[in-house]
Amino acid sequence: MTLQEQIMKALHVQPVIDPKVEIRKRIDFLKDYLKTTGAKGFVLGISGGQDSTLAGRLAQLAVAEVRNEGGNATFISVRLPYKVQKDEDDAQLALQFIQADQSVAFDIASTVDAFSNQYENLLDESLTDFNKGNVKARIRMVTQYAIGGQQGLLVIGTDHAAEAVTGFFTKFGDGGADLLPLTGLTKRQGRDLLQELGADERLYLKMPTADLLDEKPGQADETELGITYDQLDDYLEGKSVPADVAEKIEKRYKVSEHKRQVPASMFDDWWK
């Protein structure tokens, strides 16, 4: 088995999918996990990007089905901007599409800035822009877990195969969640599901960005990665990609393994 095949298997990627079937499977997963845990529903941060839009709509469909079947479940969507978000219109469009039971908004700027200032005062150095970006991601997850803890809700994560293979998420930030309904999907497959669900094309054709950096607001994921999503998707779907691209992907996969595992102990062997 080639490394490419090993990665596809490890990340549960299918080269070809039926969007209708995948939507059904992922809604059922959300419902089944909710029933098993006894939780009262879900909470998810909504950025206006493809991934949170898809996960949010799946979550709302799942809790609606639970209620229709006589159960009790709710979904809370959370806007978590840092000051003014450049693409706020897209976030509002996503919320209109998702139709969450409840939507709330937290501006994380005061919390992030207070921490950054305290760090500088205590350690006599400023956080790098990159590390401050990770603080933003982690504060967003702290907020979601606070809501989830108060309301008895599970926190949904938006990680999918194209992010997982590169480790393109913040450890214990957007990478910290209770369940991941988009696991196994490539970026283009996620677009296919949103299209099937009837989302406005603006929500799945927009340029993907983590938008965590103050110095480079709205920087494209592809710029930061040095790899396009089409290249990642081709690789993950078992297609041929240029050797240098495959090398980049495989290198990122290997060095980011710790981000896909629980904290290491001396009894684990994945890190050796």
UniProtKB/Swiss-Prot annotation:
Belongs to the NAD synthetase family. CDD domains: NAD_synthase. Pathway: Cofactor biosynthesis; NAD(+) biosynthesis; NAD(+) from deamido-NAD(+) (ammonia route): step 1/1. NCBIfam families: nadE, PRK00768.1. This is NH(3)-dependent NAD(+) synthetase. It catalyses: deamido-NAD(+) + NH4(+) + ATP = AMP + diphosphate + NAD(+) + H(+). It is an enzyme of class 6 (ligase). Its EC number is 6.3.1.5. It comes from Bacillus mycoides (strain KBAB4). One of its GO terms (cellular component) is cytoplasm. It comes from the Bacteria. GO terms for biological process: NAD biosynthetic process. Deamido-NAD(+) binds at R138, K171, D178, H258, K259. ATP binds at G45, I46, S47, G48, G49, Q50, D51, S52, T158, K187, T209. Catalyzes the ATP-dependent amidation of deamido-NAD to form NAD. Uses ammonia as a nitrogen source. The keyword Nucleotide-binding applies. Pfam families: NAD_synthase.
